[in-house]
Every structure is written in C-alpha cells, then in structure tokens.
Amino acid sequence: MKLSDVQKRLQAPFPAHAVAWKPGVITKDRSRALMLAHIDARNVQDRLDAVCPDAWSFEVEVVPGTRLPTVKGRLTVLGVSREDIGEAPEGDLGTLKAAASDALKRCAVQFGIGRYLYDLPKQWVAWNDAKREPVSPPELPEWARPDHERSPGGAHLVQAMDQLRYEMPEDLELQREVYKHLKAALGSLHPISGGNQGRAA
C-alpha cells in the first residue's frame, strides 16, 4: 500500500460533531466573533489508525530557548515523512503535550488531514462574552461534511452510534433491545431478499 492509495481517505471530512470552533477575532464591543474550525489531535490519531493503523508514527523533538513550549514534530505515513513546528498556547495550557498536539495537527495537514477546514468561508457569529462561547455554533457547509451526513438526520445517527461506544447499557436485556433496533434499521438500508432476516440474539 502506498500513500497515494489512501490519500482520499486521509483527506475525507470529519463528522460534524468532531469539528470544534474557537474565536479567531472578537469585535471591540465583544458582541461578535470570527470563528475558526479545528479538530483535536485525537481525531488525527483516529483517522490514521482507521486508514493505516500499522504504518504511521510520530516523533517530537523539543526546541530549546523558546518563550513558549515548542517542539518539532515528524509524522511518517507509509514511509513518507512531513515535519512542522508545534507551539503551546499561553497560560495554564502551555505544556509540551499541547505543543506536541499542535505539531501533530500541523504535520497531518501536510498529508491533507483536516486541510479542508482552511477552505471554510469566514463565519462571524453572535458572541457570549460571559460564557466565552458563541451564542450558537456555526454550521458546516454541505461540502465539508462526510457523505453520510449530507442526508437528513445523518449527523444525528452518527452521533448516536458514536455515543453507544461509550454508553452501552450494562443490562443484557437492554443490550438485546438496542441490538434489535440497530439490526432492524440496518436491515432497512440493505434488505435481504426473501424477507427472512432472522431474529436478534
């Protein structure tokens, strides 16, 4: 397998719930903010694990003599390496771990992971300065969503499936009930000819 074989999968948009927003610019009266989309370093790791789990690595080297914690990162995917500098933010979050996460994301962009986020249109939104958050988060355009989220209700389905990974009921009967409904829903997408789909365990 070569890098060119998996390029499209690396570059694919992330689910909408995986994209976070932070203010890039806030107006002088603190009423509006220009929001910037970004992803977490864990999203990058998940993407790499999904596409080429045994064929990527990431190394960091601390850059000495800088005001903020700074590292040089090297991401290698299928034998191809990309390097970039990662810098930690000001304040309590200014750690080497934060700098390494920043470096990983910057290196990943060079492989196309999350690069589409830089092409999003500028989005000014109402800003709640007391809560340090937008009154309502921006919406991603259709082209910046995965294919399965471009249909009505798709994003909600993906969120629900993701939630099940961490909140699966412990009770066996409830698990069977969840499985029954999931199997019925999936069966409606790909019906089996003959009408005999079996019963849930």
UniProtKB/Swiss-Prot annotation:
Q: Which domain of life is it from?
A: Bacteria
Source species of the chain: Deinococcus deserti (strain DSM 17065 / CIP 109153 / LMG 22923 / VCD115)
Lineage of producing organism:
Bacteria, Thermotogati, Deinococcota, Deinococci, Deinococcales
MF-aspect GO terms:
DNA binding
Q: Which family does it belong to?
A: Belongs to the RAD52 family.
The free-text domain note is: The N-terminal domain (1-160) is sufficient to pilot the oligomerization process and to bind specifically single-stranded DNA, but is not functional in vivo.
Keyword DNA damage carried by entry: yes
A GO BP entry is: DNA repair
Name recorded for this polypeptide: Single-stranded DNA-binding protein DdrA
